[in-house]
């Protein structure tokens, strides 16, 4: 099963030394989690929270966590770091998305409003 969509990186949690689990809020498919491997220091900045990415998710079955690959579209990291109020607002929105939305439920209207 393959899914390709535009999304916002919501969280990144370590799994092993260079392996992480990322959570992405996609435009047409909702929240998806996937395993990524940071192979070099060059692609570390891609997986920062708040970045808009071209998200590719592959798994054998729909229920599996899957392997994720991301291509950076736009980075908002510097935009949030400059202003504390924007950083707090962003963190609040991220927390709400994680708590209120279920995995793999489409929320394209909210995605459009948040961008």
Swiss-Prot record:
Disulfide bonds: none annotated. InterPro entries: DNA_rep/recomb_RecO_N (IPR022572), NA-bd_OB-fold (IPR012340), RecO (IPR003717). One of its GO terms (biological process) is DNA recombination. Pfam families: RecO_N. This is Uncharacterized protein RP548.
